[in-house]
A protein has these predicted regions:
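Conserved acidic carboxylate
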Residues: 8
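Two-component/phosphorelay signaling modules centered on CheY-like receiver
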Residues: 11-29
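Helix N-cap/capping motif at the beta->alpha junctions
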Residues: 30-39, 60
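Short amphipathic alpha-helix used as the core "switch/output" element in two-component signaling
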Residues: 39, 61-74
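Active-site beta3 strand of CheY-like receiver
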Residues: 44-50
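The feature encodes the CheY-like receiver
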Residues: 56-57, 86
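Alpha4 helix (beta4-alpha4-beta5 surface) of REC/receiver domains from two-component response regulators
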Residues: 62, 84-118
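CheY-like receiver
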Residues: 121-152
């Protein structure tokens, strides 16, 4: 069973996500801001994160940048669900295939579960491909030559 971390400061939305995830056999971890999420990630690394952007303490933007700069967390899929317009976050999606966006006003269970399944499937496919790649050979430092350009 996959674990999803919900980072949302609104209790009503927490309850909505909880119902949607339980109905589709996902485990979930509730957090109410980016700071609490950072602390909880030390205990449990989720398979996917649902992230609100407009929060107190540590905002969604700050948490997202933190997440992408920690190697162990950098490839965790994130679904931003925000009341802010999607166009504000297009620059992030262009460079991050593990990111999706859903506007809160158009949120429904089918859309959320489809995005979750799509991101988790992409993550699993990527893992399988990477696991089949041969390891890069270590550089051969003995045969490397040093060029002396002091006479030029």
């Amino acid at each position: 069973m996959k674990t999803i971390m919900i980072i949302e400061n609104n209790q009503t939305y927490h309850n909505i996500y909880k119902t949607m995830l339980k109905d589709n056999d996902y485990k979930f971890i509730h957090t109410y801001d980016g700071y609490e999420a950072m602390e909880r990630m030390d205990e449990t690394t989720p398979d996917l994160i649902i992230l609100d952007m407009l929060m107190d303490m540590i905002t969604g933007d700050t948490f997202f940048m933190y997440l992408r700069n920690i190697p162990e967390y950098a490839n965790i899929p994130v679904i931003i669900i925000s009341s802010a317009p999607e166009r504000l976050y297009n620059h992030l999606r262009i460079t991050d295939p593990n990111l999706a966006f859903i506007e809160k006003r158009s949120l429904d269970e089918e859309t959320l579960i489809r995005e979750i399944d799509k991101k988790l499937s992409f993550q699993e496919s990527t893992r399988r491909i990477v696991s089949r790649l041969p390891e890069a050979p270590a550089p051969d430092t003995k045969s490397a030559s040093v060029v002396d350009n002091s006479n030029n």
